[in-house]
Design a protein with these regions (language model features):
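Active-site metal-coordination/substrate-binding segment of hydrolases
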Residues: 84-124, 166
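N-terminal hydrophobic/helix-forming segments and targeting peptides
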Residues: 1-99, 135-136, 140
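Electropositive phosphate-/nucleotide-binding environments in soluble metabolic enzymes
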Residues: 10-17, 120-124, 157
C-alpha cells in the first residue's frame, strides 16, 4: 500500500529494488534479493521488457525475492515450527512494476495520467506478500519476481512498427 502511494518522482525501478533489499536486510535468514540491471536482462534476451523502458532515463530492474521458509522451521520464534509444507517446488509470484506508464510515444489521455503511477501495484502487492511471509515465518518456498520499468516518451522510446527480438 505504501509503495503504491509513492509519487512517481520518488518511486523509480531503482527505488523498488532498494525497498526489496531493505526488506531482505530485516529478514536475512529468510529472504534473499537479487537485482538484474539492463545489461543482465539483455544477456538473457529480455528485449521485449526492455523495449518498454527504452524511453526512460531510469534503468529497468528485475527484482527477484526468494523467501526461504525452510529457515523459518528452524527458528525458535516461528509459529509454524515443526510443520511441513507439502510443496516441493516454490510458489512464484510475478508483479508488474511499471512505476509510471505514460504510454510511451503513444501517450495516454491526460485525464487519467496521474493514476498511471499505480501500474506498479502488482509489484507492490508481491513485495507486501513476501513481507507478510517473513513476518508469519511460514514454511513455504516463494519467489517473487518484480519487473520494474518506467514507460516514458523520448527520442529513444520504442516506436510502433519496431521489431524486437526476445528469448
Amino acid at each position: 500500500k505504501d509503495l503504491a502511494n509513492q509519487p512517481p518522482n520518488v518511486c523509480f525501478p531503482a527505488y523498488l529494488a532498494e525497498q526489496a533489499q531493505s526488506l531482505a536486510n530485516q529478514y536475512p535468514e529468510l529472504l534473499t534479493v537479487k537485482v538484474l540491471g539492463e545489461k543482465d536482462m539483455q544477456q538473457l534476451g529480455m528485449n521485449c521488457f526492455l523495449a518498454v523502458a527504452r524511453g526512460s532515463a531510469h534503468e529497468a530492474k528485475l527484482v527477484l525475492l526468494e523467501y526461504n521458509g525452510k529457515a523459518a522451521k528452524k527458528d525458535k520464534n516461528s509459529k509454524t515450527k515443526g510443520k511441513k509444507s507439502s510443496l516441493e517446488e516454490p510458489i512464484v509470484l510475478v508483479g508488474k512494476g511499471i512505476t509510471f506508464d505514460s504510454g510511451g510515444i503513444s501517450l495516454k489521455p491526460g485525464l487519467g495520467m496521474g493514476e498511471m503511477k499505480y501500474d506498479m501495484g502488482g509489484a507492490a502487492a508481491v513485495m507486501g506478500m513476501i513481507k507478510a511471509l517473513c513476518e508469519a515465518r511460514l514454511p513455504l518456498q516463494v519467489v517473487g519476481a518484480l519487473a520494474c520499468a518506467e514507460n516514458m516518451p523520448s527520442g529513444t522510446a520504442t516506436r510502433p512498427g519496431d521489431i524486437v527480438t526476445a528469448m
